Amino acid sequence: MKAVGLVVEYNPFHNGHLYHIKEAKSETRSEVAVAVMSGSFLQRGEPAIVSKWARTKMALASFADVVVELPYIFAVQKAETFAEGAVSILNELGCSSLFFGSEHGDIEAFLNTAAHTIEHEDRLNEEARKQIAFGLSYPQAMAKAFRSVTREGGNIVDLSKPNNILGFHYVKAIMQKQLSMKPETVKRRSSGYHDSTFPEADRIASATSIRKSIFETGSLADSRFYLPKTTVDELDEYARTFGMWHSPEDYFPFLKYSLHTMDTEELKGIYEVEEGLEHRVKKAIRKAGSFKEYMELLKTKRYTWTRLQRMNTHILTKTKKADVKRMLNETHPAYIRLLGMTKKGQAYLAEKKKSLSAPLITKTGSFSHPSLQLDIKAGQVYSAPLKEPVRTMLTEQEYSLSPIRYDEDSRIFLRK
């Protein structure tokens, strides 16, 4: 069976994601869609609106066939590391192609851009270092360096757009690793990634605008038009069971406690706490009464909201620089954690299992690795804002839940 790989967050799964999966299968003529999905916390450092299990169910009910977890060590990272981790896992699972949505929509431009930057990588990095020295943030410095290096590059992708940036890094990772996996793209329909309002006519809205509506209204009334029915059902069920949808503000009391009980030297050892940020963090947390207020006090021209939000998540999970460095030194995936599969997905995995060089994990108790322990810890932190007994129930799912199975013919879940 031929499989297409997708790199996803599904926060939550919406009509644009449904379009993406259908296009991916159709354009690549693949029978199976394999999604590598961020777990409890996402690339921008935010908690997922609902658990990875609920989001897996949304995906399986909407034409994904295999859902595996992108480990925390890759998921809560800058675009380059995020992409490298996801590409490695999809390659390990035997995907013939990687299909991504982008603002540009032309794969030749991505191939040309990636090839040009690989060829001029030393010059690009040197130019970026100069811009950072002038006080620019890492994304701003890279964007300026990139424009300088690619001025003569011809058909080049606009890397000021968020999905173009991720797509560029997928293509670059495939090229640098010399993989046979073929990158392909489709132009995003309607709303942009960061759009915070709903479009007037189209049934496709950004995940950002959907979450904004959900958190502002406390209901799905305004957003259900942009969501598959299965997503609406899962969001409703999650709120009924766990009493909330997760937002960054929910974690502020725990962040405040962590920072008040952590000395400056310990804070300095946390991943992404750089260049004296520990002093700024300590000062901001003393004055702030909310997560938003804290972030406004913390943010500078040099450090973006996203970069600081990731740092805060690493503080919550007590992720140390030394541990990250050691885990990122591994050249191949240490394991692949299966979250869910359809009948067709199960058949595909049975076909590929013998050729896997990394163990396919279905229960966390059957395997031990520092990266997996970090995933479990992230899940425990994720459940912190919940009230008992559902907090313990969600935490226990990290250990007790087997992969979710979905019968795509009868359209029923075989295990709740």
From Swiss-Prot:
Gene3D superfamilies: HUPs. Its EC number is 6.3.4.-. Its main location: cytoplasm. GO terms for cellular component: cytoplasm. ATP binds at residues 7-20, 101, 163, 188. It comes from the Bacteria. It is an enzyme of class 6 (ligase). Keywords: ATP-binding, Cytoplasm, Ligase, Nucleotide-binding, RNA-binding, tRNA processing, tRNA-binding. It is found in: Cytoplasm. Catalyzes the formation of N(4)-acetylcytidine (ac(4)C) at the wobble position of elongator tRNA(Met), using acetate and ATP as substrates. First activates an acetate ion to form acetyladenylate (Ac-AMP) and then transfers the acetyl group to tRNA to form ac(4)C34. NCBIfam families: PRK13670.1 (NF010191). Belongs to the TmcAL family. This is tRNA(Met) cytidine acetate ligase. It comes from Bacillus licheniformis (strain ATCC 14580 / DSM 13 / JCM 2505 / CCUG 7422 / NBRC 12200 / NCIMB 9375 / NCTC 10341 / NRRL NRS-1264 / Gibson 46). The lineage of its organism: Bacteria, Bacillati, Bacillota, Bacilli, Bacillales.
